[in-house]
UniProtKB/Swiss-Prot annotation:
Native source species: Borreliella afzelii (strain PKo) (Borrelia afzelii)
Matching InterPro entries: aa-tRNA-synth_I_CS, Leu-tRNA-ligase, Leu_tRNA-synth_edit, M/V/L/I-tRNA-synth_anticd-bd, Methionyl/Leucyl_tRNA_Synth, Rossmann-like_a/b/a_fold, tRNAsynth_Ia_anticodon-bd, Val/Leu/Ile-tRNA-synth_edit
Subcellular location as annotated: Cytoplasm
Motif ('KMSKS' region): 617-621
Annotated protein name in UniProt: Leucine--tRNA ligase
Reactions that this protein is recorded to catalyse: tRNA(Leu) + L-leucine + ATP = L-leucyl-tRNA(Leu) + AMP + diphosphate
Residues binding ATP, per UniProt: 620
Motif 'HIGH' region: positions: 44-55
Top-level taxon: Bacteria
Amino acid sequence: MSKYEFIKIEKKWQEFWDNNKTYKVIEDPNIPKEKRLYILDMFPYPSANGLHVGHPEGYTATDIFARYKILNGFHVLHPIGFDSFGLPAENYAIQTGTHPKKSTEENINKFKKQIKALGFAYDWDREIRTHDENYYKWTQWIFLQLYKKGLAYAKEMPVWYCPELGTVLANEEIIQTPNGPKSERGFHNVEKKYLRQWVLKITKYAERLLNDLEELEWPESVKEMQRNWIGKSTGVEIDFEIEGYNDKIKVFTTRPDTIFGITYLVIAPENKLVEKITKDNFKSNVLKYIKQEELKSDLKRTSLEKDKSGVFTGSYAFHPITNVKIPIWVGSYVLGTYGSGAVMGVPAHDERDFQFAKKYKLKILPVISKSGKNEILEKAFINDGISINSPDEFNNLKNSEVKDKVIKWLTKNKKGKETVTYKLRDWVFSRQRYWGEPIPILFDKLGNAIPLEKNDLPLKLPETANYKPSGTGESPLSRIKNWVNVKDTDFTRETNTMPQWAGSCWYYLRYLDPKNSKEFANHKKIEYWMPVDLYIGGAEHTVLHLLYSRFWHKVLYDLGHVNTKEPFKKLINQGIITAFSYQKENGVLIPNDQVIEKDNKFFDKKDNKEVTQVIAKMSKSLKNVINPDGIIKEFGADSIRIYEMFMGPLTDSKPWNTKGIIGVFRFLNKIWNLREKELSKDNPPKEIMSQLHKVIKKVTEDTEKLNFNTAISAMMIFINELSKYEKNYLNIFKPFIIILSPYAPHLAEELWEYIGETPSLFKNSKWPKFDETLIIKETKEIVLQINGKIKDKILLNKETDEEELKEIAMENSKIKSNLFNKKIVKIIVIKNKLVNIVIK
């Protein structure tokens, strides 16, 4: 029996695909739009660690779908590139003393080697790298379009600054912890600092970013996260005059029906009125409070915790309708960047305001009650009801009627107006780091910004050995004086660089025309391919990359550079591949290399105490990161591809278990060993012909729906049936090779050649069609149980034997998920009825 030499086979076909450019695609105008597909992965950041087994999950999913569609006659664009600018490369360079350009190139080469070893059907002629001058030239050009459209501006503003990273971070890059705000990357301390920043007016597109979500085939959870991040509120902006000042405080509210219950106002610490209106004898308290609160993140300040703090300014405002004096407070739970930076306190009808009023002994005035009468309030009344304690024309009415009357009164008397606000803030676009796109702006002596012309692009990132952060908040570029000061002029260059999100905002467009030196992409090529039909990547990018790229795309659409309103038609978030970790009794996770196994139990080497096996995210500190290189060497790329898809539904998180790949490897060996049988051109028995059409149907339907795990399960069942026959029937084997090929392309190509066909299979075959009339309906419903409780029901061939039933049951995803950390006592099989797995 000839051995399944997967290393030799995979190397052979990877070289064949490369040499013959099997997956190269060009724009053929004769192919109709409905037969074109743009399938895309979120491109990787080339870290020094290389790929781990979690990376190929999404790539394998798009690869299977792309190959399946190619075999179904579709013209498929499936490109790859590298998101190679940004903080991680620079931090790695600082740690190792290797220039980021050199280390990035080395890491890309490592990633490419690993990606190619997995046999993905990428068109490598379209490869892009965001740090390449010919790429970031167009990133800079798009920034200039934003600037010319009035969507990019520079301003002094309070921003999050990370001393450790040496740069400003956007709100989206800050996470709140019990120990204060931290940087998302590196988990470092951050502080507030006033710096001149470039900002993009994403808020101008808030309404469209919100409304156009309805047109997208995206997970509802992702759409909801974007809706919440954009945070649209419809209400009224009310003007409050300040006693003794000509200034007004503008307050936005969605509850104008509670206006007569206002007993205080709160303004944000950043509000410029704070310094002006705070009375002298209150100033020290106010300044102390602001200093105390300034390190809290926006998320912490606006969290749902009811215990909010504040301090009185000593000043008062006038109620716009009743003219009653209202005390003005400063409170950090109000953000200067959201709405008008002020809120009205209505403690009788808002739980947060109620707690605030109780804490500071402020008046609580109910103006709505269920009965229309005064009632003792033990907590805020937030429901609909009848108005009370209000001026006559507003009293004894449903609160919905009061709302309408108040809006009309405020509008008529020019004390307020209906308006819409958003939580979304403009995007802080500057970074005080070296490894990023230089911002193509000059400044004259007066500080006026002057955009570079197109023919001055790219503004190249200057070479320097001194790329470390300055520590002062200035960019490392500011130290390169002969670059900052433009020769023979009085102009100076902007020294901040763009954030790492800049290059990823539009990369999907550059794939369409990566070698174009005259424009970012030819318009005809954009019309040919856009939008992206299927985009697969992690949900962690919901309010960063996915929101930013939608914004840039809409700007390009408005300028006539792209033909679609949205870049990504359908989005799928793959689940996280986790790994086994080990937890001590006190809940602490310990590194995997600190654990030993004895008699199916796990112990800490240091103290010999038993630990519990748990599932956790892969991390270097836990030493549970699994590199695919070793897996490929031991089992092959086709094995890892099929195993990752077989672990469970694509969108579910699931734990990696290297033992699980052995079953997949056996499956591929079983297919390979069919070569040992006579390859017969005889007509196959009707039973196996029926099974063939059944598996073609199942794999077709499941692959179309991205249900790869169940498609693989069907192929495994079929191969068990096919292996029972003495002959290997060509009319059976050939179509099976084709349906296997998206999943195990290397093995499929080898078998395609073995049966005498011309490679590549992906150029010289078509996806087989199933014939319902040939499918014999001799199946039985088998119940799968654990300890007598039904977990799943499946249809199987009546002739499936006991051992196969056991194997199928054990590989069932609903059964597998219930067996984690359990001991199997016995497996009871009743043929054509049930499989019951007894565990303890």
